[in-house]
Regions:
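Residue(s) in the substrate-gating loop at a strand-loop-helix junction
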Residues: 144
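The beta1-alpha1 cofactor-binding region of Rossmann-like NAD(H)/NADP(H)-dependent oxidoreductases
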Residues: 40, 60-71, 106
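Conserved glycine-rich cofactor-binding loop
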Residues: 7, 12-15
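Conserved glycine-rich Rossmann-like NAD(P)H-binding loop of the short-chain dehydrogenase/reductase
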Residues: 28-44
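Substrate-binding pocket helix/loop in short-chain dehydrogenase/reductase
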Residues: 97-101, 105-110
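Active-site helix of classical SDR
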Residues: 124, 160
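C-terminal helical subdomain
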Residues: 177-180, 184-185, 192, 201-242
């Protein structure tokens, strides 16, 4: 896929992997809209890229709020045109320190699912119709190794990523032949604020930098993404950077 001129929507783009993806995509010529709940951080990230002469925009919405989805997509489309690539990156862990399932409040589980699964589902629904009509589009869902491993205390987050991945596979089956494809990517353990909140005693020097992972994901998009079967699951650690 040639990213030059492509309209890309990245959620959770005010920090961490989302911010790194937004920057890397913009520097490859994409027209990027970043979305996050934190207005100041989101606008600062976009403004820094615009200062480089890049096509980057900031929107402030909560993807876990169903009333925000269509205004979000409408605003993004007004800025860069119909979305070619959607990156569902926004995630929440729920309360930290991470609790055991026995101690997890139902309301906290519900919030994690609203953001990580239902929000991504709503956004995908909101952009997929246009993609089908145009005969092209890619949805990149940022998953986790927690989707395949049962880590104590990561229950709510793990369940959300399992659901997100399987939704991708069902989307892939239902939209086969339309030109719209779906990929799940496990970025691996990264030195992000979210990971530090979850694992405060980790050796952060051994974790991946978001910028490194972003470079690998963008290389995937520019390389073999379109040739992979829709619904494929990938690990960023096994990808090559551009």
């Amino acid at each position: 896929m040639k990213l030059l001129g492509k309209a890309v929507l990245v959620t959770g783009a005010s920090r961490g992997l989302g911010q790194a993806l937004m920057a890397t995509l913009a520097r490859r010529g994409a027209r990027v809209v970043g979305v996050a709940r934190h207005a100041g951080e989101m606008e600062a990230a976009a403004a820094a890229l615009r200062a480089e002469g890049l096509d980057a925009h900031a929107l402030t919405y909560d993807v876990g709020d169903k009333e925000a989805i269509y205004p979000l997509v409408g605003a993004a489309t007004a800025l860069v045109g119909p979305i070619d690539v959607l990156v569902n990156n926004a995630s929440t862990l729920g309360p930290t320190p991470l609790p055991l399932l026995l101690d997890t409040a139902c309301e906290d589980l519900q919030r994690v699912l609203e953001v990580n699964v239902v929000g991504a589902f709503r956004l995908t629904k909101a952009v997929a119709g246009s993609m089908v009509v145009r005969g092209q589009g890619l949805v990149l869902n940022i998953s986790s190794d927690a989707a395949v491993s049962a880590y104590p205390r990561w229950g709510a987050y793990s369940v959300s990523k399992v659901a997100l991945e399987h939704l991708s596979r069902i989307w892939a089956a239902e939209l086969e032949g339309t030109g719209v494809s779906f990929l799940n990517v496990d970025p691996g353990e990264m030195d992000t604020r979210m990971y530090r909140d979850a694992v405060p005693d980790a050796d952060y020097s051994k974790l991946n930098r978001p910028e490194v992972v972003a470079a690998r994901l963008v290389a995937l998009l520019e390389g073999r993404a379109e040739s992979l079967p829709s619904g494929t699951r990938l690990e960023a650690s096994k990808l090559e950077a551009a």
